């Protein structure tokens, strides 16, 4: 049994299980079907652009399925050069990179300050040991 035959069989089995074949409704898979007697259902394990049409005279528009499954995420992020947002979905917009920069600068400052304090403490400990010895 070939891959296409397995996908078609899986689609028919899925349609029978959901009752879409009996009621004439279209499953919510992103595939637009012309209203009529036949039903179009995509296989659960198959890609969105593969559909099994049941009945005669069914016109299936696969463009909606392709757009839903294969579309690249288009967003304005720093990395794509299409905007100033970080693209994290936090709603920060152009403030996101500014906040990230301030937090990063604060972290670097705190790290450098702690290194200076540690080196000053170790110098004092060395001087104290020399004075006590």
Swiss-Prot record:
Region annotation Required for localization to magnetosomes: where it falls in the sequence: 1-75
Applied use: Transfection of a codon optimized gene into human adipose-derived stem cells yields cells with magnetic crystals; the crystals do not have a noticeable effect on cell proliferation, migration or differentiation. A fusion of MIC to barstar (an RNase inhibitor from B.amyloliquefaciens) binds and stabilizes coprecipitated magnetite nanoparticles for at least 2 months. Cells transfected with barnase (the ribonuclease target of barstar) can be specifically targeted by magnetite-bound barstar which could be used in cell-specific cancer treatment.
Annotated region (GL repeat), positions in chain: 83-92
Domain remarks: Fe(3+) binding by the shorter form (residues 75-133) is inhibited by Ca(2+) and Mg(2+). The C-terminal 21 residues (magnetite-interacting component, MIC, residues 112-133) self assemble into multimers up to octamers; this fragment binds Fe(3+) which alters its structure. Another paper showed binding of MIC to Fe(2+) via Asp-123, Glu-124, Glu-125, and Glu-127 with a minor contribution from Glu-118. The isolated lumenal MIC binds Fe(2+) and Ni(2+), Ni(2+)-binding may not be physiological; in this paper binding to Fe(3+) was poor.
Consequence of changing residue 79 to A: Self-assembly of the mature protein is reduced
Keyword S-adenosyl-L-methionine part of the UniProt annotation: no
Region listing for MIC, self-assembles, binds magnetite, Fe(2+) and Fe(3+), in residue ranges: 112-133
Taxonomic source organism: Paramagnetospirillum magneticum (strain ATCC 700264 / AMB-1)
More about this protein: This bacteria makes up to 20 cubo-octahedral magnetosomes of about 45 nm in diameter which contain membrane-bound crystals of magnetite (Fe(3)O(4)).
UniProt GO MF annotations: metal ion binding
Coiled-coil residue spans: none
NCBIfam families per the UniProt record, alphabetical: Mms6
PTM text: Seen in gels as a band of about 6 kDa which has residue 75 as its N-terminus, suggesting it may undergo cleavage. 2 forms, a full-length and the shorter protein are both detected immunologically in magnetosomes.
Effects seen without this gene: No effect on bacterial growth. Magnetosomes are wild-type in number and size, but slightly less regularly spaced. Magnetite crystals are smaller, irregularly shaped instead of cubooctahedral, crystal growth may be incomplete. Magnetite-associated proteins Mms5, MamC and MamD levels are significantly decreased. Single non-polar gene mutation has a slightly reduced magnetic response, crystals are smaller and elongated. Magnetite crystals are elongated and their surface structure is altered, iron uptake is wild-type.
Regions that span the bilayer: 83-103
Superkingdom to which the source organism belongs: Bacteria
Primary localization class, coarse: membrane
Subcellular location: Magnetosome membrane
Result of changing residue 125 to A: Makes rod shaped crystals; protein is in magnetosome membrane
Result of altering residue 95 to F: No change in self-assembly of the mature protein
Subunit composition and interactions: Full length protein oligomerizes. Full-length protein interacts with MamA.
Protein name: Magnetite biomineralization protein Mms6
